[in-house]
Amino acid sequence: MFVIIKSAKKTPAGVVGYWERDWDDQKVWEVGWSVLPDYQRQGIVTAATRLLIAFVTKLKSHRYIFSYPSINNNPSNAICRKLGFTLIGDRNFEYPPGKVLHCNIWRLDLLQIS
């Protein structure tokens, strides 16, 4: 996880992170983010995730990055769209434990990143 810092005051605005997971019998990256309400809708997460994608691409360890925002989380789905992810479906996930969350499945092919 990385803390997203806003401005020269070094104010934390949110977090963005990546981790390894299994998807259809292959290792992939999953990316996720959270931003504090005062910093939403400013492009901060899009910019931070773009930097994270560049970092992960250089690792050359997995072909895909996935993201699983709730189908009702329009801002997070828009971030995936802006960053070139492809919507490949939806699925129910248990998150947090004990709660079912209906999520979109977004995939970014790192081989297509120039």
Located regions from the model:
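Acyl-donor (CoA/ACP) binding surface of acyl/acetyltransferases
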Residues: 1-114
